[in-house]
């Protein structure tokens, strides 16, 4: 049976479809209770189109196969312009090689364009540079970070 995929915004029921476990393939998630998930989901939803999480669901199994998010930053630069920040793009290891990551990035970039953003940016590992170049992005700067434990 052929796999079919549907891209859409995150729904509250997606926790039961492996959403948190999928994020665990990207980085540390910790244990997120249903109550914590529901609270964070409602908080993010309250931001409307300024914070969007998309998922790709494999329709036969109902599992979340890929995800990514974007936050819209409102600036004073560029005539009070907006910039999109893509984060947390991950494709389940079982579904890699099917262009799902590219579909997630395109979905998020399309959202940024529809919101009137003048640019979209993201941070990625050196290993993922070629993937993002294939999505139409180019190396612009160096990322700096400081983690607070």
Curated annotation (Swiss-Prot):
Protein name: Glucosamine 6-phosphate N-acetyltransferase
Organism listed in the record: Arabidopsis thaliana (Mouse-ear cress)
Entry keyword Acyltransferase: yes
Taxonomic placement: Eukaryota, Viridiplantae, Streptophyta, Embryophyta, Tracheophyta
Record's subunit section: Homodimer.
Temperature dependence: Optimum temperature is 35 degrees Celsius.
Disruption phenotype annotation: Retarded vegetative growth, delayed flowering and short and thick inflorescence stems and siliques.
Gene3D superfamilies in the record: 3.40.630.30
Matching InterPro entries: Acyl_CoA_acyltransferase, GNAT_dom, GNPNAT1-like
């Amino acid at each position: 049976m052929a796999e079919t995929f549907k891209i859409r915004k995150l729904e509250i029921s997606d926790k039961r479809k492996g959403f948190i476990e999928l994020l665990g393939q990207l980085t540390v998630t910790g244990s997120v209770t249903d109550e914590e998930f529901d609270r964070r989901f409602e908080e993010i939803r309250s931001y409307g189109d300024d914070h969007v999480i998309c998922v790709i669901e494999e329709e036969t199994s109902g599992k979340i196969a890929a995800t990514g998010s974007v936050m819209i930053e409102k600036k004073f630069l560029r005539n009070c312009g907006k910039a999109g920040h893509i984060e947390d793009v991950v494709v389940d290891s079982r579904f890699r090689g099917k262009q799902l990551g590219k579909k997630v990035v395109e979905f998020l970039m399309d959202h940024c364009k529809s919101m009137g953003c003048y640019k979209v940016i993201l941070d990625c590992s050196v290993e993922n540079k070629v993937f993002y170049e294939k999505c139409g992005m180019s190396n612009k700067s160096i990322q700096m970070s400081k983690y607070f434990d």
